[in-house]
Design a protein with these regions (language model features):
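Extended, non-catalytic substrate-recognition/exosite surfaces adjacent to catalytic cores, especially
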Residues: 1-227, 231-253
Length: 253
């Protein structure tokens, strides 16, 4: 294969020819239509609790937290008094099982603990966006777990970063967090396939998927699974009036 520099040079200066099954007109049409928000329905029919969190359809557990339950209008996340305690040695305990999720991770071969926001949603200008979480920016060396799996932030952290939290009544406020990129919902993807040859004519991987961390359903590798069979196998067979046990053509690999 070619590296990027060599491939780019061949395309623009070397006269290399690239053959593709893609149909430029079809590709242009689906790209245009995917930019029109009115082509996609807004999420409806979901249940919320008294705080605006979206509940699962079964069981009543929270599926998506309301953005406002994490971040206030001034852009602060505030730890509630029931979510933390100050210890006598000056360290801070953040309780597990509350709004912040605490995960064991490994960074450069060392154990770390990721302090993360749970998935949330927001509605902006009538558009529904999901936000797949985020995390507090606390360096690795200041964190450990206690016997109850709570997170303990050492006293040294508050000496080195005295402005990370500010006391706001009984709450601790901070802006030192990162949120993952919001994603418009519902998402969608499309692949147009020539059912005679199997050639891909056009494809698009989602709505508003510009961004390094966003998932592109057209180009991201994933396990095909049985969900692909109705599209790639059964639908073309039915269109050709194949019977249940009828074999199709075989082609050498």
């Amino acid at each position: 294969g070619y590296d990027y520099t060599k491939a780019s040079n061949l395309v623009y200066n070397g006269g290399i020819q690239i053959y593709t099954t893609m149909d430029s007109q079809a590709q242009s049409v689906i790209e245009k239509e995917y930019k029109i928000d009115s082509n996609f329905p807004e999420p409806i029919g979901y249940r919320t609790d008294s705080k605006g969190n979206i509940l699962n359809s079964t069981g009543g557990g929270v599926m998506l937290y309301a953005y406002s339950n994490y971040i206030n209008k001034e852009g602060y996340f505030k730890l509630r008094s029931s979510e933390y305690k100050w210890n006598e040695d000056g360290s801070l305990t953040i309780y597990a099982g509350k709004r912040l999720a605490i995960y064991d991770t490994t960074v450069q071969g060392q154990t770390d603990y990721s302090v993360e926001f749970k998935s949330m949603y927001t509605i902006e200008k009538g558009k529904f966006y999901s936000i797949p979480g985020g995390y507090l920016n606390i360096p690795q060396q200041y964190k450990k777990r206690d016997a109850d799996n709570n997170l303990v932030v050492s006293a040294d952290f508050f000496k080195d970063y005295p402005d990370f939290f500010t006391q706001d009544g009984k709450k601790l406020a901070t802006k030192d967090f990162s949120l993952k990129q919001k994603v418009i919902q519902p998402q969608s993807a499309m692949t147009i396939v020539d059912n005679k040859t199997g050639a891909i004519k056009a494809m698009i991987g989602g709505r508003k998927i510009t961004g390094r961390m966003l998932y592109n359903r057209a180009t991201a590798p994933r396990q095909p699974g049985s969900s692909i069979k109705p599209i790639a196998v059964y639908a073309p067979a039915l269109q050709k009036s194949f019977e249940c046990e009828q074999a199709g053509e075989t082609f050498p690999l």
